Curated annotation (Swiss-Prot):
Biological process annotations from GO: iron-sulfur cluster assembly
Name the UniProt record assigns to this protein: Chaperone protein HscA homolog
Family that this chain belongs to: Belongs to the heat shock protein 70 family.
Molecular-function GO terms, alphabetical: ATP binding; ATP hydrolysis activity; ATP-dependent protein folding chaperone; unfolded protein binding
CDD domains: ASKHA_NBD_HSP70_HscA (cd10236)
Taxonomic source organism: Aliivibrio fischeri (strain ATCC 700601 / ES114)
Function: Chaperone involved in the maturation of iron-sulfur cluster-containing proteins. Has a low intrinsic ATPase activity which is markedly stimulated by HscB.
Keywords: ATP-binding, Chaperone, Nucleotide-binding
InterPro entries per UniProt: ATPase_NBD (IPR043129), Heat_shock_70_CS (IPR018181), HscA_NBD (IPR042039), HSP70_C_sf (IPR029048), HSP70_peptide-bd_sf (IPR029047), Hsp_70_fam (IPR013126), ISC_FeS_clus_asmbl_HscA (IPR010236)
Gene3D superfamilies in the cross-refs: 1.20.1270.10, 3.30.420.40, Actin, Chain A, domain 4, Substrate Binding Domain Of DNAk, Chain A, domain 1
A Pfam family it matches: HSP70
Gene that encodes it: hscA
Length: 616
């Protein structure tokens, strides 16, 4: 008889290779990769294609995903969903404002999320994304010959909580076990870092079909640290197609609106022309009754404003990282749109070096995700690689006066947990509203509200006596949990922040820009609000003290002097001069100094009443 012997807690077959994959869930195309025989490779379909167009067509009796769906887009635009990643985590109003030309019939669900009317009924962006993930999962399981233990799915670094949560929901709907969501530029760094063993600062320029990300990373002794991120969640190669399509419309003299089918045909023509211009100086094109020619120089001039926007984001990211372009050792190009020669030369000129393109820019993200999945599933327990992502915008809490107290600053590495203690403002206060905000500005009204929740059951105490510990925790996927706990009783309240929809495009960049533009004004506004809050505290404290002990401890003249100081402070409090309010607070403190001393003496006498010196 043969017995299988294993260490306690270990598998009886500890060297069995667990099946895990990395998925690049892209706006235009998606890929799946896995580590096989020690090497990460993308997995092809039965026809040998590694790229799966991120297109889903809903027919009455079936759902098509990929190339078949893509080829049907022009004939059946309303039932063929392309670039669904652009819709993830957005409100219907935001989608209609940003993409008015989309051929879909939208409506709004009961919870305010957008749904698309198709031949199979209503579908939402999460369901559409899940169909793409199902297709990639089937491909992986057929190729690898078994059930998947887990997946790592990549997302743009600029995806907010709602967009990340939507991606995880899509994976769950597809029956996948998500090991981790991974920022796309970070996945590329893993692929290049492990392949070439570089150490130092690198810039990852990721221009896909629908998103742009720039990440400044430091690679050192196996540690991938993201120093800063930037980008635009709605800028990519699709926009190249749109500006070229608009040019063709103008050249053809088309002024009346196009049908859905004609619009799709025009965009398909624009895409084909863009690709052809990567290898040719001139391309002949025709649309409807018009024929013409476009040169690569003209095409470059059309897309130059879009490329300039990406380079401005690069400049901001370098500034955030406190790095100069000269300190960047390598520039990694990621995303199919970086195949455009003018993109490569523009980025090369900006950074003063030839960008790295040795790994297929379409496949590099999936390859990096596969390497990470292989580690997380336990196939490389001895791996020393450490991965540190960052949050793109500061997370804070509203305090008295509409001020923002930042708990976790932007560009903090995640996962992270930070706590801060707060107290009550009024005597006998038994509840507290916790307002979670996002952004770089000093005042709540200038930031983005994420969530509100209440902490109830605080024991009645004097103002400032209660201790409420508020903990912000961001997990590896960038999702935020907030807990508030009153320390003496242990009573607590908790919320996981999952906004109903995400930031509109350019909003993150604008929030960062505004924080610099209005820095001086914000600090003045904060200083004023802080003095107003302090004035309120002093006024309320003195009024309560006078009501309780004024007659017993003060003469009428002394009471009148303090009341005069209070009234003067109330008047100053209503103004906008922070220094004047601060001076008024000092005068009120000086006027009440003797009163405070007498109250302290009276309290001590009351506490010691009836006790002997020995007992004291």
């Amino acid at each position: 008889m043969l017995l299988q012997i294993a260490e306690p807690g270990q598998s009886a077959v500890p060297h069995q290779h667990k099946l895990a994959v990395g998925i690049d869930l892209g706006t235009t195309n998606s890929l799946v990769a896995s580590v096989r025989s020690g090497e990460a490779k993308t997995l092809p379909d039965m026809k040998g294609n590694v790229i799966l167009p991120s297109v889903v067509q809903y027919q009455e009796d079936k759902i098509c995903v990929g190339m078949n769906a893509y080829q049907s887009a022009a004939m059946d635009p309303q039932n063929t969903i392309i670039s669904v990643k652009r819709l993830m985590g957005r409100s219907l109003k935001d989608i209609q404002a940003r993409y008015p030309e989309l051929p879909y019939q939208f409506s709004e669900s009961e919870n305010g999320l957008p749904v698309i009317q198709t031949a199979q009924g209503e579908v939402n962006p999460i369901q559409v994304s899940s169909e793409i993930l199902k297709s990639l999962s089937r491909r992986a399981q057929d190729t690898l010959g078994g059930e998947l233990e887990g997946v790592v799915i990549t997302v743009p670094a600029y995806f907010d909580d709602a967009q990340r949560a939507g991606t995880k929901d899509a994976a769950t709907l597809a029956g996948l076990n998500v090991l981790r969501l991974l920022n796309e530029p970070t996945a590329a760094a893993i692929a290049y870092g492990l392949d070439s063993g570089q150490e130092g600062v690198i810039a990852v320029y990721d221009l896909g079909g629908g998103t742009f990300d720039i990440s400044i990373l430091r690679l050192s002794k196996g540690v991938f640290e993201v120093l800063a991120t930037g980008g635009d969640s709605a800028l990519g190669g699709d926009d190249f197609d749109h500006v070229l399509a608009q040019w063709i419309k103008e050249q053809a003299g088309i002024t009346s609106p196009l049908s859905s089918q004609e619009q799709r045909e025009l965009l398909t023509l624009a895409t084909q022309t863009k690709v052809a211009l990567s290898d040719s100086d001139n391309v002949k094109i025709s649309f409807k009754d018009w024929s013409g020619e476009i040169s690569v120089e003209l095409f470059n001039s059309l897309i130059q404003p879009l490329i300039k926007k990406t380079l401005m984001a690069c400049r901001r990211a370098l500034k955030d990282a406190d790095i100069t372009s000269e300190e960047v050792m390598e520039v990694v190009m990621v995303g199919g749109s970086t195949r455009t020669p003018f993109v490569r030369t523009s980025v090369g000129d900006y950074f003063g070096q030839t960008p790295l393109t040795s790994i297929d820019p379409d496949q590099v993200v999936a390859i990096g995700a596969a390497i990470q999945a292989d580690i997380l599933v336990g196939n490389k327990p001895d791996s020393e690689m450490l991965l540190l992502d960052v949050i793109p915008l500061s997370l804070g809490i509203e305090t008295m006066g509409g001020l923002v107290e930042k708990i976790i600053p932007r560009n903090t590495t995640i996962p992270v947990a930070k706590a801060q203690e707060f107290t009550t403002f009024k005597d006998g206060q038994t509840g507290m509203m916790v307002h979670v905000v996002q952004g770089e500005r000093e005042m709540v009204e200038d930031g983005r509200s994420l969530a509100r929740f209440s902490l109830k059951g605080i024991p009645p105490m004097a103002a400032g006596a209660a201790h409420i510990r508020v903990t912000y925790q961001v997990d590896a996927d960038g999702l935020l949990s907030v807990t508030a706990m009153e320390k003496s009783t242990g009573v607590q309240s908790h919320i996981q922040v999952k906004p109903s929809y995400g930031l509109s495009d350019n909003e993150v960049a604008n929030m960062l820009k505004d924080s610099m533009t209005y820095a001086k004004e914000d600090m003045k506004a904060r200083a004023l609000a802080e003095q107003q809050v302090e004035a309120d505290r002093v006024i309320e404290g003195l009024v309560v003290a006078l009501n309780n002990d004024g007659d017993a401890l003060l003469s009428k003249e002394e009471q009148a002097e303090i009341l005069q100081a209070i009234e003067a402070l109330i008047t100053l409090r209503q103004g906008t001069d922070a220094q004047a309010i601060e001076d008024g607070i000092k005068k009120a403190d000086e006027a009440s100094q003797e009163f405070a001393a007498r109250r302290m003496d009276a309290s001590i006498r009351a506490a010691l009443a009836g006790q002997s010196i020995d007992e004291v």
